[in-house]
């Protein structure tokens, strides 16, 4: 598994744009290729979940969506994905009320280029519940991995991003925009 200080590997996934529930809306495609070169000069919060249409995953996705503006205020793009395809993600958005018109990017890593490049494939064949905070130079600055049965805390990811961006010493339990040492 790649860790802090490692460079984000080359990858190509199908991105599902924020706010779309259908493959095309008003003549605009919901899909766009996302690579390591996408979103230049932005921080990236890349999180993985095991499968679409499951039970824990939508709670995390919805919470990242609720916090999307706060991430964007910190020049960060949130991207959440699994190995399920892009059409599955759109169907899930239409099916689950908390994911309707989801305001953040999702991605389909059907080839495993990013899952395997980061080294986060579980023995079951799905992605581990991993989160990577990547700086604008595509260097990994934070990694967190949970077992398949435990959801993560997107608010904690926001807190960590905020602390990393201070470039200062940040104490335990420092609140978002809190004091540094």
Label every PLM stretch briefly.
Residues 1-181:
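Chalcogenol-based redox active-site neighborhoods
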């Amino acid at each position: 598994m790649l860790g802090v200080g490692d460079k984000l590997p080359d990858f190509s996934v199908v991105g599902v744009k924020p706010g779309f529930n259908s493959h095309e809306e008003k003549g605009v495609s919901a899909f766009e290729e996302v690579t390591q070169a996408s979103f230049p000069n932005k921080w990236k919060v890349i999180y993985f979940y095991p499968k679409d249409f499951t039970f824990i995953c939508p709670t995390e996705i919805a919470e990242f969506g609720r916090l999307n503006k706060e991430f964007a205020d910190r020049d960060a793009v949130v991207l959440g994905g699994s190995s399920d395809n892009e059409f599955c993600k759109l169907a899930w958005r239409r099916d689950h009320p908390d994911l309707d018109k989801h305001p953040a990017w999702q991605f389909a890593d059907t080839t495993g280029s990013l899952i395997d490049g980061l080294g986060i494939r579980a023995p079951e064949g799905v992605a581990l519940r991993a989160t990577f905070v990547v700086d604008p130079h595509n260097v990994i600055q934070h990694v967190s991995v949970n077992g398949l049965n435990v959801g993560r805390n997107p608010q904690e990811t926001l807190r960590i991003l905020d602390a990393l961006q201070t470039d200062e010493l940040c104490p335990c339990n420092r609140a978002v925009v809190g004091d540094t040492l």
